Curated annotation (Swiss-Prot):
Transmembrane segments: none
Subunit: Part of the 30S ribosomal subunit. Contacts proteins S8 and S17. May interact with IF1 in the 30S initiation complex.
Role: With S4 and S5 plays an important role in translational accuracy. Interacts with and stabilizes bases of the 16S rRNA that are involved in tRNA selection in the A site and with the mRNA backbone. Located at the interface of the 30S and 50S subunits, it traverses the body of the 30S subunit contacting proteins on the other side and probably holding the rRNA structure together. The combined cluster of proteins S8, S12 and S17 appears to hold together the shoulder and platform of the 30S subunit.
GO biological process: one example: translation
Native species: Pseudomonas syringae pv. tomato (strain ATCC BAA-871 / DC3000)
Listed InterPro entries: NA-bd_OB-fold (IPR012340), Ribosomal_uS12 (IPR006032), Ribosomal_uS12_bac (IPR005679)
Gene field: rpsL
Ranges annotated as biased composition (Basic residues): 111-123
GO cellular component: small ribosomal subunit
Cited SUPFAM superfamilies: Nucleic acid-binding proteins (SSF50249)
Modified residues (3-methylthioaspartic acid): D89
GO terms assigned for molecular function: rRNA binding; structural constituent of ribosome; tRNA binding
Name under which the protein is recorded: Small ribosomal subunit protein uS12
Amino acid sequence: MATINQLVRQPRKRIVEKSDVPALQNCPQRRGVCTRVYTTTPKKPNSALRKVCRVRLTNGFEVSSYIGGEGHNLQEHSVVLIRGGRVKDLPGVRYHTVRGSLDTSGVKGRNQGRSKYGTKKPK
């Protein structure tokens, strides 16, 4: 236990919380340009081909971003919006692309959970 005198001379240090999404720089989303669109395999015990894109953000960061939903229209030089949110079985992927904004289309034929995939209400 520190004495009052010690605390007067040198106060207690605050614990600095480290951000999970440093590239967003305290913004809710960021815009960027796809530099590479590819598929990758998840960690054990899962098995799939997960759709991922490398994005160069407007603030200069280059990050990997997961493309959720079935099917997408992204290619190199597509402009995308990314949000935070990691993919647990893909190491190094800490961001999600926002479906239905900028160059990213919504998921076709989606009827439930549409707001998460940028799909309009069917008529």
